[in-house]
Amino acid sequence: FHDKGGDDKSAESFSSLGILTAIADLAEHLDLVRNQEPGLRLYRARPGFKKSSPSAKDFGPPPRTVCQSNRMNPAGVPMFYGALDPRTAVKEVKEQSSQVGFFITVEPLRLLDLSRIPAVPGFFSEEPRRLRLYLSFLHYFADDIMQPVARDDRVHTEYVPSQVVTEFLREHTFEVGKLDGVVYG
């Protein structure tokens, strides 16, 4: 929880904030942070609708009062989870009976695209050790947020690490500005 001092170039001497900042800087350097022009179609499935024609509001994020904990957000902090195709949206909700809606973006978005993380260099690569560690972290984070979410009454503390990283990414100011979203898959 603190900087031990020592060599500023040693990853072991970084604070947690320093490590996350370095990973965010690497993501930007690798062009994982990208601008998305307006017109992107995002799909969202909602299970068990009783209405025959739901409204756009029905497909938005849930109200704070009923927002459950997910891989990237704690309970009470709503986030919009969208998919790039209807099939993925339906798979996300894991319900046989669901309706799918879509949104078309009208403004440019700044996105962190975790689907484009380069492979981790091999152990005998001449790439710096820190690059291997940070790329490994990005891959683990991407894998973690894609895991199924349990829908039960338990408190899922195992979601806290990915929620903390997500909150850091939401608040971090990249060279192009703050992020609007994360792409994974």
Placement of each model-derived feature along the sequence:
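A short, exposed loop/beta-hairpin motif centered on an aromatic-Gly-Thr core
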Residues: G76-G82
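Short active-site loop/helix that positions an aromatic residue
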Residues: P86-S97
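Active-site and NAD+-binding cores of ADP-ribose-processing enzymes
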Residues: F1-G39, R44-N73, S97-G185
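Conserved structured core elements
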Residues: A83-R87, Y159
